[in-house]
């Protein structure tokens, strides 16, 4: 049974002194029959109290506020987790029966959120691709594998061309991006055929080189297969997400699973850097591989924070209202 020690460090460097930093962290690995947390330590600059609760999707969410003036904030998670290999779906059930089972899920609350499509300009083109790639006698499992292959073959893995805010329109047009972009496209394809699909954030932990996303935060997809449950599928690497994938959170998209996000008061600009290291504990003595990779596409130069953008928006609205009032008085 694989055992991984993972260290995930998030560092904010502010252009000036800030305060009242309110943050949400999703750094607590999922615990279920196939994944177990042996121990975990989360440390944060200023040692604020962290309130941990479970969200709608079953993820463990930590919330904290750091009120003291500061110009640097570091959030560090160190966790030891074990994973268990899961057998693959048995593909011997009549396809028609499986598709009927999926139809029944369309009105069941836990699955509705994972069936909603996101409209974008290229949706009609994607619909054509889905129809072309699908065979009439395919099972949902076969569809998942084929669509995963399609994304892997037709999208180019390039860091830096997209951000977490990049829309499906841009991803579809460029046919380029990183793991979260590959995941979002595959999710949309599966939902077109009413296969429940959800976004997964976590880590990919292997002792061999060549896997995209290795040693860094990663994203993939889980698709619901009748008589099996949620199947992890990684379109970035065209593989089943099994015991080398450590899950942090699941949701409708990246926004539901962002490892760290928050707002603050003060200087409007900041710089963010993220590093992840993975040590595979199950390797024989002397053969431990520690991979430390700065996530280039998650490093942003000084940019305005959401609190500042919100205040600017409010100020703009007030100015517009004032101008309208002045015009009315002049009339």
Task: Show which residues each predicted segment covers.
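Secondary-structure boundary elements
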Residues: 83, 101, 105-177, 185, ...
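Intrinsically disordered, low-complexity N-terminal segments that are enriched in acidic
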Residues: 1-87, 94-97
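Short intrinsically disordered coil segments
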Residues: 25-27, 41-42, 59, 91-100, ...
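Secretory-pathway-linked proteins and extracytosolic
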Residues: 78-117, 285-293, 297-308
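Alpha-helical and coiled-coil interaction segments, frequently adjacent to or embedded
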Residues: 279-331
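Hydrophobic/aromatic-rich core segments of domains that either
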Residues: 149, 181-268
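Structural beta-strand/beta-sheet cores of well-ordered domains, especially the beta-sheet scaffolds
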Residues: 2, 8, 21-23, 40, ...
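Short beta-strand segments enriched in hydrophobic/aromatic residues
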Residues: 14, 81, 225, 278-280
């Amino acid at each position: 049974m694989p055992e991984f020690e993972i260290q995930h460090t998030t560092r904010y460097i502010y252009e000036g002194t800030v305060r009242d930093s309110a943050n949400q962290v999703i750094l607590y690995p999922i615990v279920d029959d196939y994944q177990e947390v042996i121990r975990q330590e989360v440390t944060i600059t200023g040692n604020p109290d962290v309130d941990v609760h479970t969200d709608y999707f079953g993820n463990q969410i930590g919330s904290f506020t750091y009120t003291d003036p500061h110009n640097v904030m570091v959030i560090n998670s160190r966790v030891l987790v074990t994973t268990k290999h899961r057998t693959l779906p048995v593909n011997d059930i009549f396809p028609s029966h499986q598709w009927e089972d999926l139809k029944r899920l369309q009105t069941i609350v836990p699955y509705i959120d994972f069936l909603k499509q996101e409209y974008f300009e290229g949706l009609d083109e994607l619909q054509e691709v889905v129809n072309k790639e699908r065979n009439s006698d395919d099972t949902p499992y076969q569809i998942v594998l084929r669509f995963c292959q399609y994304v892997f073959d037709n999208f180019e893995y390039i860091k830096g061309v997209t951000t977490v805010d990049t829309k499906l329109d841009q991803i579809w047009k460029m046919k380029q991006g990183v793991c979260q972009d590959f995941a979002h496209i595959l999710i949309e394809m599966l939902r077109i055929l009413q296969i429940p699909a959800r976004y997964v954030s976590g880590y990919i932990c292997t002792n061999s080189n060549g896997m995209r996303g290795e040693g860094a935060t990663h994203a993939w997809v889980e698709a619901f297969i009748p008589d099996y449950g949620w199947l992890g599928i990684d379109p970035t690497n065209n593989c089943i997400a099994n015991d080398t994938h450590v899950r942090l959170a699941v949701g409708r998209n990246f926004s539901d699973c962002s490892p760290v996000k928050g707002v603050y008061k003060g200087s409007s600009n900041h710089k963010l850097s993220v590093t992840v290291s993975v040590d595979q504990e199950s390797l024989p003595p002397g053969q431990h591989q520690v991979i430390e990779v700065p996530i280039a596409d998650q490093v942003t130069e000084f940019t305005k924070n959401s609190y500042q953008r919100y205040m600017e928006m409010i100020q703009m609205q007030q100015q517009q209202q004032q101008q309208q009032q002045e015009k009315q008085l002049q009339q």
